[in-house]
Amino acid sequence: MNYLAAMLIASISGIRGTVGGQAGEGLSPSDVVQFASGYGAWILQKHHAPDRKPIVVVGRDARISGPWVRDIVCGTLNAQGIDVVDLGLSTTPTVELAVPGLNADGGLILTASHNPKQWNALKLLNDRGEFLSKDAGERVLALAKSTLTFADVDDTGTTTHDDSWLQKHVDHVLDLELVDPDAIRSAGLKVAVDAVNSSGGLAVPLLLKALNVEVVPVHCDPTGHFAHNPEPLPKHLVDLTDAVTAESCDLGISVDPDVDRLCFVSEDGSFFGEEYTLVAVADHVLAHTPGPTVSNLSSTRALREVSARHGCTYTAAAVGEVNVVAQMREVGAILGGEGNGGVIYPTSHAGRDALVGIGLFLTLLVSKGMTCSALRATYPDFSMVKDKMDLPPVDVDKALGVLQAEVKDAEVNDVDGVKFDLEHGWVHLRKSNTEPIIRIYAEGPSPEEAQALVDRFKGDLERHLASLEGPQA
């Protein structure tokens, strides 16, 4: 990962930054041109169809900066001789489906996911509609720093607009074998939806109305003026909780701005828990199609236990969707994802998809004939605490190694940072892929025990970091 500046971060998964300021210090128009052209050069190197220009699918969430970022991205790619299909307001999984659906060479998603409205980003997809591998991402970064040649005037590309893909995405979900539209339609559900005033305000109600669900909209106007911090955490979802109880809803649904994260609020206003979105979907999928499951190292133990209930194996992967997908392919997983509410169902496609998650979850809920809170009570109950600290200018990996050597009461996994599995819980410490921070996640039988693990290991890491000097490796 290359930190170009405090608020401009380039990594193998894309570039993100805050809008405004000088070039190289935030996400400026010149930075967008530089990175989009690096990606375009990579697309051109891979393209071998002499009868047509390369095609890239572009979609965006509703961020205020989205229109000008889109215009620059599309214009830059056109100037390189690449045709663009612009989906307009869209979702990350919608673009992922559209890339192979249009036989395109790649895709660009303009979204900073759960980051606040001042952030935006370019996320990069290959011709399968999946995030780039480490090698491909590094190649794009290298090309972005090089001197690039653009197309002659007669060879420039064009941009066409296609706003049909949200409906195609909904139709795709309804056609999945393990989604039962008729059962959901017959249940007469009432659901509150908080889409943080982004593109989920279009996509989620479109799916729910196709399932005969009465929708109570909460922040569903896709203006990009986020009504609260867009990360779907309990402290940010007070309006959704209030709507669920005030309107006597069967449940509430929250998605992040680009609709790849999904969490639920139960009918009594309690939080189902974003960690348990994947757990519940796994319960449904494994009951019908048993097979291996995968989640990342920072996800709840409950998935492992629910997998075991169905006689299935569980494997942990490094954090990051591309790592989870790679591990899923290695073990032949039937389902995977991340504990932040990201469901990856490869029967659909190899990417986190909140719409797919909604279809599978509602099918499970109506098939059980339970309330949302009663369903939650059927799963192992763990508590998670998520903390972080600023990334210091020292060798963090060395400090983690010292910490690893001194801990004797845990099983250790150092594939991605260091995870300590203890008898009654775990703690995972790692450098973030997207922000200049160290993430510290812990899980235990109770909130107090999880917090105690965070306090213990965070304190030990701070002690080791303070003893180090010199530049970060």
Could you say what each language-model-derived stretch is?
Residues 133, 217-219, 270-290, 354-367:
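Gly/Ser/Thr-rich active-site loops/lids in small-molecule metabolic enzymes
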